[in-house]
From Swiss-Prot:
Homotetramer. It comes from the Archaea. One of its GO terms (molecular function) is 2-dehydro-3-deoxy-phosphogluconate aldolase activity. Its EC number is 4.-.-.-. It is an enzyme of class 4 (lyase). GO terms for cellular component: cytoplasm. Belongs to the DapA family. Pfam families: DHDPS. This is Uncharacterized DapA-like lyase PH0847.
Length: 287
């Protein structure tokens, strides 16, 4: 498991129901571009606005459509819900799950470790830990290390953490466990992660510019660092959309609309789309 993995948006219709036709189009588009994997029920996919049943249906539909490495987000504030969703992911044939640390309530490190260990013990499926301290309880390097060394099915981590120190600390775990995977969740950290010894990225902008992420990946794998750096600079520019929009999800969907994708600019409440002024600024960046 490596390379460019896309955390899919969840397309919605005007009535806020899931647009499965648009979802299928997006998956096929990304596969044609050559991405290495698909990740459904992600932060980008507004998983917190979906019901448990919708998350299961979405996971099933994605598995039906894609032939690539397939990951399902099974995070929740409830450990038992995580176990339920993770069991479901295994039943439908997912290649692995991505589990964000519990959010809303602040937890101590031992509680976070217990949360993940309970899932790892209950469900034998590859698990990728998801560290995103801006939205959920932080996962310390020591907790990641302990989980990686104690549970063979904890195979890696996705780090949406704006810190090279944290990223390099994760990669040091590979010295003790060679097959441990380290993915960045930040587009601007994609190349730095590869240079440090990481395995790829699970990045939101790959929904609408996967060709640039693949340029970085392919150039790096061929040893053409100059070309990889040039493409990585494009990604840094594109991530400016996040500082323009009022929310992460709004930025990504507006960028997709700006590039002419058959995706409606609709978010599930309480999220709201930004207006025309923000759209014009994002269009200038991504066009």
């Amino acid at each position: 498991m490596e390379g460019v993995i896309v955390p899919l948006i969840t397309p919605f219709k005007e009535d806020h129901s899931i647009d499965f036709e648009a979802l299928e189009w997006l998956i096929k588009f990304l596969e044609e571009k050559g991405v290495h994997g698909i990740f459904i029920n992600s932060t980008t996919g507004e998983f917190t606005s979906l019901s448990l049943e919708e998350r299961k249906i979405l996971a099933e539909k994605g598995r039906e459509v894609t032939s690539r490495t397939y990951l399902v987000g099974t995070g929740s504030t409830s450990t038992f819900e995580v176990i339920e969703l993770t069991k479901h992911a295994k039943e439908i044939g997912a290649d692995g799950v991505v589990i964000v640390s519990p959010y809303y309530c602040r937890l101590k490190e031992d509680a976070i470790f217990k949360h993940f260990s309970m899932v790892a013990e209950k469900v034998d499926i590859p698990i990728i830990l998801y560290a995103i301290p801006s939205c959920a309880n932080p996962i310390s390097l020591e907790v990641v290390r302990k989980l990686a060394l104690e549970y063979s099915n904890v195979i890696g981590v996705k780090a949406s953490v704006d810190s090279l120190t944290y990223l390099s600390g994760l990669i040091e775990i590979k010295e003790e466990r060679k097959d441990f995977k380290v993915f960045t969740g930040l587009d601007q950290y994609f190349l730095p992660n590869l240079i440090l010894g990481g395995d790829g990225g699970i990045m939101a902008c790959a929904n609408f510019v996967p060709e640039i992420h693949l340029e970085v990946w392919n150039a790096f794998k061929k040893g053409n660092l100059e070309k990889a750096m040039n493409s990585a600079r494009k990604l840094v520019k594109i991530t400016k959309i996040y500082s323009i929009a009022s929310s992460f999800a709004s930025a990504v969907k507006l960028a997709m609309v700006a590039r002419g994708f058959p995706i409606k600019p609709i978010l599930r409440p309480p999220y709201m789309m930004d207006g025309e002024e923000v759209f014009k600024k994002i269009k200038e960046i991504v066009s």
